[in-house]
């Protein structure tokens, strides 16, 4: 059975299915949304970005994080290619760990208006101190199962 593509409120501007240049900055990046075909069902979507990078705003040195984004969608889903491009736009962005993590969560929440969203940013040590940053919206819907984010506490090589 063949399905035709669904129209979205932004369908003309979707990045999916076409060549797109890497956005120069997070503000320039577009996060696309597509209709949720299961909008009447409470469930969880997880995106994991184990190789997220940004730049220290003071030294310009690269910072690395393992991001886990969980959300209970409402009417919209995040289109994953656009999310990949958005996250990649941080590669040349100077921002503190806390700001990068919370900004990503807020931006996604603003674009898709999920029932619930949380982001965990597990940053690798710089100066010997790992920084973990967590942010979420509201309360989780009752019947949604949320597994552990699966990122172990940083233990170094010991």
From Swiss-Prot:
Reactions it catalyzes: 7-aminomethyl-7-carbaguanine + 2 NADP(+) = 7-cyano-7-deazaguanine + 2 NADPH + 3 H(+)
> GO cellular-component terms in the record?
cytoplasm
Location of the active site: 56, 63
- Fetch the Pfam families from UniProt: QueF
Give the keywords, sorted: Cytoplasm, NADP, Oxidoreductase, Queuosine biosynthesis
InterPro entries in UniProt: GTP-CH-I_C/QueF, NADPH_dep_7-cyano-7-deazaG_red, QueF, QueF_type1
Enzyme Commission code(s) on record: 1.7.1.13
Pathway info: tRNA modification; tRNA-queuosine biosynthesis
Where substrate binds, per the record, is at 78-80, 97-98
- GO BP terms: queuosine biosynthetic process; tRNA modification
- Give the Gene Ontology MF terms in alphabetical order: preQ1 synthase activity
Q: Where in the cell is it found?
A: Cytoplasm
Function (record text): Catalyzes the NADPH-dependent reduction of 7-cyano-7-deazaguanine (preQ0) to 7-aminomethyl-7-deazaguanine (preQ1).
Which NCBIfam families does UniProt cross-reference here?
A: QueF-II (TIGR03139)
- Family assignment from sequence similarity: Belongs to the GTP cyclohydrolase I family. QueF type 1 subfamily.
Specify the protein name. NADPH-dependent 7-cyano-7-deazaguanine reductase
Annotated source species: Rhodopseudomonas palustris (strain HaA2)
The gene designation is queF
């Amino acid at each position: 059975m063949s399905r035709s593509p669904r129209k979205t409120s932004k369908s003309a501007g979707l990045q999916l299915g076409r060549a797109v240049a890497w956005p120069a900055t997070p503000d320039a990046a577009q996060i696309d949304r597509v209709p949720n075909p299961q909008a009447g069902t409470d469930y969880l979507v997880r995106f994991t970005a184990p190789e997220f990078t940004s730049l220290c705003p003071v030294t310009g040195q690269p910072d690395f994080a393992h991001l886990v984004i969980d959300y209970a969608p409402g009417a919209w889903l995040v289109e994953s290619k656009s999310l990949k491009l958005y996250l990649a736009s941080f590669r040349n962005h100077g921002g503190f760990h806390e700001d990068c993590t919370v900004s990503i969560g807020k931006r996604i929440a603003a674009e898709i208006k999920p029932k619930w969203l949380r982001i965990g940013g597990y940053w690798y040590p710089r100066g010997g101190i790992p920084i973990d940053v967590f942010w979420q919206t509201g309360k989780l819907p009752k019947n949604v199962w949320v597994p552990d984010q699966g990122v172990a506490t940083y233990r170094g090589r010991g």
